[in-house]
Amino acid sequence: MLIGKRISGRYQILRVIGGGGMANVYLAEDIILDREVAIKILRFDYANDNEFIRRFRREAQSASSLDHPNIVSIYDLGEEDDIYYIVMEYVEGMTLKEYITANGPLHPKEALNIMEQIVSAIAHAHQNQIVHRDIKPHNILIDHMGNIKVTDFGIATALSSTTITHTNSVLGSVHYLSPEQARGGLATKKSDIYALGIVLFELLTGRIPFDGESAVSIALKHLQAETPSAKRWNPSVPQSVENIILKATAKDPFHRYETAEDMEADIKTAFDADRLNEKRFTIQEDEEMTKAIPIIKDEELAKAAGEKEAEVTTAQENKTKKNGKRKKWPWVLLTICLVFITAGILAVTVFPSLFMPKDVKIPDVSGMEYEKAAGLLEKEGLQVDSEVLEISDEKIEEGLMVKTDPKADTTVKEGATVTLYKSTGKAKTEIGDVTGQTVDQAKKALKDQGFNHVTVNEVNDEKNAGTVIDQNPSAGTELVPSEDQVKLTVSIGPEDITLRDLKTYSKEAASGYLEDNGLKLVEKEAYSDDVPEGQVVKQKPAAGTAVKPGNEVEVTFSLGPEKKPAKTVKEKVKIPYEPENEGDELQVQIAVDDADHSISDTYEEFKIKEPTERTIELKIEPGQKGYYQVMVNNKVVSYKTIEYPKDE
């Protein structure tokens, strides 16, 4: 039991999240980097099987050499106590197979969005000379945001490798297997392209194109049967999209896309207006194709040689007898004429069936597939017209035969030509474009076309409330009005935005938040002793208020504390006179440190012969201090620090 086990002292296994024939996948915690990872562990049954170990390691080596947003990242590879493991990126979501089961068939636009990511990943692998060889929805992950990750390169092979496995022991899944793999050929880049076409078919229809009771029967269908039309199960599929499937799944690799990049380019342009109604993709048969030459047996050669000898001998004999026969020829000619006349009379009167074709009743082939219907007609001795005509029918499924011309049970002569009519299904109507209309207008327009199964999905959008912003199927799609459903996506207007509390936001952060939510900033400024300069002081409407995109929000930003003026302080200073000898002059220096003076400079200098009083003026800034000192004969006699005066 691996749950709870710590591998390599680093990966704590939490629970099982998946598994396959070769390995199980667990959710684990990387305790060093504090993140969730997926860890694939080779089954214990194969821990001693060198081939499986080699294939397991190849998966890590193949994927780790690739760097693409749609390929699962490989973090680590190792072995501990016969536990072989690969540590990889954890994708929180589900497999594409599970997604199709839950949501299929998908809308063509969603299907192509998914396929574009998958094909981009495979194109990157091909550029690095790696063929995946097991492309299927089970090996593709999709997260909750619709992002795709291709995984499971367990049987991927480098094209330059000398260990490419031939498919006589077929690896991969038979439902997605290319014809060349099914017949035992090499898996190439074009084999991956074939599998991509099958995946696109499954996305659009919710089903696989070929199924059967055994792997062999399915493989035979890949070899022999044409890929069915996706439109049969999803009429909303444009021809440009179906053509991608048909080209990718061509039986001969020569007729497929040359590269995955070519397929990706077609996917990106499939909904361009000039492509939506393009002609169906078909493969032109080469008129100069080599025809089979029947084998001539030895006996036939001998017979032909004998006949030639007989001709030569007869010619020689005839030459000898020629003169004798000339006399008998009128009697011979008369005898031959009598024989032919007698035979003609007998043929017309006694044996008419020898010259007249027999009567045949045309069988009823309605509801049959073309091959079965044509076979039945030919069995009755009838010729089948090469051109099959199409006709709508309310009861017979699309693609099956409806009727013949002449009609069933009509008696005709053997060898007569019969024309087949194939059902296109129930009569279809091309749905109009109702986007941009109000929901009531759209419903009326659709009802006028006969569409009664209309559902509405309401979403927030910038368009006015009640406006149709999307329709599914898209305009121009042919549908059966009495059966097919039309889904309208209708705007209920922009979603309300609940304002955040913008306090402590800088001007840049506040304006960015409002812009991201489509709100207009009305900027104001005010002094604040509490809020640092440049930050939000207040907002209007208040935090928690619901507003619509486009509304104005008034935001007041702090200018910081309001600046006070510098103040002048007057100080009276008494200077003592204390000479060593009476009558000596004393040198006085006054220094001031304030807004206008530096303590290193002399504010005032003079001489005294008696005690003196002076008034000093100091200019002090708010929050600052003033200072003065008095020196007599270079000796400090007084000094003082003065605070900024408080307001009265």
UniProtKB/Swiss-Prot annotation:
Alphabetical GO biological process terms: cellular response to peptidoglycan; protein phosphorylation; signal transduction; spore germination
Outcome after substituting T165A: 4-fold reduction in activity. Abolished activity
UniProt effect for mutating T162A: 4-fold reduction in activity. Abolished activity
Catalytic residue positions: D134
Residue numbers on the Cytoplasmic membrane side: 1-330
Residue ranges annotated as Extracellular topological domain: 352-648
Primary enzyme class: transferase
Modified residues (Phosphoserine): S214
Marked site (Required for activity) residue numbers: K40
UniProt miscellaneous comment: PubMed:18984160 shows that peptidoglycan fragments serve as a novel mechanism of interspecies bacterial signaling that likely indicates the presence of growing bacteria and thus serve as a signal for dormant cells that growth-promoting conditions exist.
Domain notes: The cytoplasmic domain has Ser/Thr kinase activity. The C-terminal extracellular domain containing the PASTA repeats binds peptidoglycan.
Function field: Protein kinase that is responsible for triggering spore germination in response to muropeptides, signaling bacteria to exit dormancy. PrkC is thus a germination receptor that binds peptidoglycan fragments containing m-Dpm (meso-diaminopimelate), which act as spore germinants. Autophosphorylates and phosphorylates EF-G (elongation factor G, fusA); the latter modification is likely necessary for germination in response to peptidoglycan. Another group did not detect phosphorylation of EF-G.
Subunit structure: Homodimer.
UniProt name for this protein: Serine/threonine-protein kinase PrkC
